[in-house]
Amino acid sequence: ETRCGTMVASTSLLHSEVQEAVKDLMAAEGWDLEIVEFTDYVQPNEVVESGDVDANYFQHVNYLNSYNEEKGTHLAIAGNIHYEPRGLYPGKQSDLAAITDGAEIAVPNDTTNCARALLLLEAEGLIKLDPEAGITATENDIVENPHNIKLVPLAAEQVARTLEDVDFGVINGNYAMEAGLTSADAVALESADSEAIQQYVNVVAVKEGNENNEGVQALVKILKSDEIKDFINENYKGSVVPYDGE
């Protein structure tokens, strides 16, 4: 017996693949999950705000908060599902403990990913940032650089292709996957409890007041189930990681 229909909006192939895996598990519990795909990052929030769609699964916490602030919308988090860790990958060097003076590290040149790269380098003890910088850190916020590391800013999708020309590179999970790299190849990864992951964990979002909607709760429960965690781990090899927190 089908208890109810739940509509969920998504954008990327990753989110759609995960939701297709969820669909059968939802059906087994009597839910008809309808997936509505979009090609931009605005419409999925518009249809949730309007009530046309129950939930969406495509964005991280930081984007949701910024969207609410900019648009005056009332989106809320129903569940934290996964994160896509940035990794520090070896190029001409592979041992962080023996990093040479003046080593070149390729980093994404966009604001968000550059900040995450800098926070990762700080977590590994390679640089020290102004403590006030947080997830808005830029190269100007580096207050200690004992190894005289030289940052090489590149478009995020280009970093993996330039590893042979630099000593290390900080690569987004999706681009690492496209380059045939896995998390096991990285010499360092963002940790689940890092400041960056708390802001960039991907969530199921609903309109405020619908967090406890029965269908939404069923969706979140299944997205956080062992079956879906196994699906993510097997298919994305550490480039996408299930979030174990609440």
State where each predicted segment sits.
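Ligand-binding "clamshell"
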Residues: S66-A78, G91-S94, D165, V170, ...
